[in-house]
Every structure is written in C-alpha cells, then in structure tokens.
C-alpha cells in the first residue's frame, strides 16, 4: 500500500475529478466489495470515516451527490441514517469505484493497520505500519495459508475478507493463490455478518 497521505491526496483528487480506476477482471472492485459486504460492516466503515476522517467523508458525500444529480446540501440535511443508506447504495455503482476505494483504503490503513501489519509480517514482507513499497510477484501457498489463518484467528472473518480482496485488487498484487483462497475458503465470504 502507498503511504496514507498519498492515498488521501490521490483518492480525494480522483473523486473530485471523477477519475475511474483501472479495472481488473479477476477480483472484486471496491464498489462490489461495498455491495457484497454485510450492511453492518459497511455502516461501520462509513461511521468510522464520518467520525475520524471528515475530509474523506465529505469528498465521498460530494461524489455521491454528483452521481445522484443533487446538491450536496440536500444530502447533508438528511438524517444521518438516511444519508448513510443513500451513500452506501450509491457507492455500489461502477462509476463510483474510486470513491468506494478511497473509503475502504482510509478505513483499512487508519483503523485496521494492526491487521495489515500482522498479514505482511506473517508473509515476511517488509512494511511500515502496514504500508509496503514493493510487493513480491508471488507468495508460496503454505506461507499464504498460514498468514490468512492467523488473521482469521485474530480478526472478524468478514473484515479479513474485505482486506484481502482489497489487498489483491488495489495493490495490483493479483496473487492467483490468494484469489483462489478468497473464492474457496468459506470463512472469507462477504456478507456473512448480516
């Protein structure tokens, strides 16, 4: 992962310009992750952003307002629960993948950094608070399985699933064995928490 400041700067600028990230056929995109995860986890991510990352929340809200062809003030005046439902429903659209990706990256890097560090350390990948400059082109199956198992023993399975899907897509790592594990491991299925 790039540095959090870089993510914020690029992500917010991309949202404001409406740039869509490059798509990869094999993995779930950010807008799909938000659509498939449980409503409780999606709301937790949005609540964290609202409470801890106001500039990101506002940029995402602006992107949603533009996508829905309404003024920002219209969404700001809604009750928070209604506004959050609107945000989450809108972020599942493909044209808002950058906004969804920024929301997920901020939540992962700022709130789930311990999980990121645990995963990378288990794989023997040098990192700084879960941020990596260069990823290996591949990792061995036994090492990957052990790293994923250690995450599942320590963190909520759906949170692990979101991280691993985002990791494989956003970092362009695209490790085939991680993709296979995400598809076959029942504990890594999204939406299980309700």
Indicate where each model-derived feature is located:
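Compositionally biased, intrinsically disordered low-complexity segments
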Residues: 13, 18, 22, 48, ...
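Hydrophobic membrane-targeting and insertion signals
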Residues: 2-20, 27-36, 181-182
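A short amphipathic alpha-helical interaction element
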Residues: 10-11, 42, 116
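Acidic, low-complexity, intrinsically disordered interaction modules
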Residues: 47-171
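Alpha-helical oligomerization segments
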Residues: 161-192
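Generic low-complexity segments that are intrinsically disordered, proline-rich and/or Lys/Arg-biased
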Residues: 3-5, 32, 40, 56, ...
